Amino acid sequence: MNSISEEAKYTIQKVHAREILDSRGNPTVEVDIYTGCGFGRASVPSGASTGSNEALELRDKDADRYNGKGVLKAVDNINKTLSKELLGMDARNQREIDELMIALDGTENKKTFGANAILGISMATAKAAADSLGIALYRYLGGTNAFALPVPTMNVINGGKHAGNDLSIQEFMIQPKGADTFSNALRMGAETYHALGKVLEDKYGASATNVGYEGGYAPPISTTADALDALVSAIEEAGYTESEISIGLDSAASEFFDGDKYFIDGNKLAPAELVDYYLDLIETYPILSIEDPFHEESFEDFAALTSEAWDTIIVGDDLFVTNVNRLAKGIEMEAANALLLKVNQIGTISESFDAANLAQRNGYSVVVSHRSAETEDTMIADISVAIGGDLIKTGAPARSERTAKYNQLLRIEEDLGDAARYVQL
């Protein structure tokens, strides 16, 4: 019987990509990586509202296939080019592999091969390495200090580009921050989600419980206050207090900015007026966090709100796009106080971890996030624990591409046992 050498255990022996479907029925990239004694499979998410500074997601633009949204070019870039470069490399050398792909691509936004191609390999490499070593992915990525479970921030009312209603704000979220364990937090969130369904159905009819891309309800609500009132009622109906479950907003404000003013709740507001608008909401409702409250280039306005709302988590998503250069600018200007981490915005695991490290070194919170078009891949759950993320944003406790991430966190909490700690905000 031939025994495999220690070095060969971790050597990449095969890389294969394919086109699969995401949760919105559009194609995405899936990558398999085989080492001498391990295997990793990863699939890449996609966003609906995207920052203009994100790494490029390569689409075929062939109108005869999937309305131009096919990803066969990205798949071919893996199978015909990148795979040959990776064969024989040690899967444990994550940064070396990521930097090689970046260098081979040769562009700032990864447009040569596509960030969806590069990220698929980057994710699958980490999974294959962990499997080869026989350790959990969160432990492989995070080391011995990975033991904190993030607070889930659950998108339970969808608006903006995530729904077909008239709400300007894209996401209304609940955050069971008062739980003592992640499993209890998930239960509290699910109970409140179901209570919200009843509140909405009683007020707006059965159609109000239709769901959007991320599992949240998409009721016929047109004002921010009506949505927030429904959340407050649901929290009370579920038997919880505002100190136990807070509210988060994702404005995705670039989507309702006309270059001069913001169109929200039927009004056009100048940036200074929008600051006051948010401050009024914070005063009235138990709002813990606001994501992308202004246009993605409005660093000064982010800084103004961060200064005024000093005890609120102001999250930069399109503002930072998980990019260390944009994040460094935000830190210097004191624009926002939290990073939204989306691995497909930047395109590699190494660069994502660099952004998280920079944020945390400067006192910024980190929120690990899904995208509106997801797959059954659960890696962001492991990443959240690995980096010590404060919150995880992965949709409502509904639709299996969302609950897959929550269920993975339950498994991680179980694996950690008595060492598990639930983040306190």
UniProtKB/Swiss-Prot annotation:
Catalyzed reactions per annotation: (2R)-2-phosphoglycerate = phosphoenolpyruvate + H2O
Superkingdom of the source species: Archaea
Gene Ontology molecular function: any one: magnesium ion binding
The protein's required cofactors: Mg(2+)
Major subcellular site: cytoplasm
InterPro entries attached to this UniProt entry: Enolase (IPR000941), Enolase-like_C_sf (IPR036849), Enolase-like_N (IPR029017), Enolase_C (IPR020810), Enolase_CS (IPR020809), Enolase_N (IPR020811)
Keyword terms: Cytoplasm, Glycolysis, Lyase, Magnesium, Metal-binding, Secreted
Pathway: Carbohydrate degradation; glycolysis; pyruvate from D-glyceraldehyde 3-phosphate: step 4/5
Descriptive protein name: Enolase
Residues annotated as catalytic: 214 (proton donor), 342 (proton acceptor)
Ligand binding (Mg(2+)): 250, 291, 317
Keyword Metal-binding set for record: yes
Listed GO biological process terms: glycolytic process
Matching SUPFAM superfamilies: Enolase C-terminal domain-like (SSF51604), Enolase N-terminal domain-like (SSF54826)
One GO CC term on file: cell surface
HAMAP family: Enolase (MF_00318)
Positions of (2R)-2-phosphoglycerate binding: 170, 342, 371-372, 393
Note accompanying the cofactor annotation: Binds a second Mg(2+) ion via substrate during catalysis.
Enzyme class: lyase
Provenance organism: Methanococcoides burtonii (strain DSM 6242 / NBRC 107633 / OCM 468 / ACE-M)
Family: Belongs to the enolase family.
Gene3D superfamilies: Enolase-like C-terminal domain (3.20.20.120), Enolase-like, N-terminal domain (3.30.390.10)
Protein's cellular compartments: Cytoplasm; Secreted; Cell surface
EC number(s) reported in the record: 4.2.1.11
